[in-house]
Amino acid sequence: MPRRAQTARKEKYAPALSRTTDKIVVKLMMNGKKGLAERILRQALARAEASARRPGLEVLDAALRNATPIIEVKPRRVGGATYQVPVEIRGDRRMSLGVRWLVQAARKRTGKSMSEKLAGELVDAMNGIGAAVKRREDTHKMAEANRAFSHFKW
């Protein structure tokens, strides 16, 4: 029996954003080190807050909005040819693609620590620049270029 009183668990983030932050933590996590991934995210949000002069979660929300794709192309075989058919993305896949692209872009950056790289990518994505936003723009351009094949949707 413990002699000390049990402490209540504290919520780290607002409930609405906790799903988003949890997804980012899972994408950041390597070798099961969830505590380290959470610390990286917390530090990145603090750095982003300092550089953008806006609350960290607001920066994260804006960055995700700018990096999240709405439409993508999927290959569809018709006759002997394969066409890239533009398809609208479901909400959950949209979110996971945005998070994945942000984390991948942050990992590719050159910098000191992962929290610095992630903070830089978040601020860039919030401002509409950066690798994750560029990837979204490329995806949308590809869908726009293949709009003629949209009648092949299944």
Enumerate the language-model features and the residues they cover.
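Strongly charged
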Residues: 1-31, 35-38, 42-154
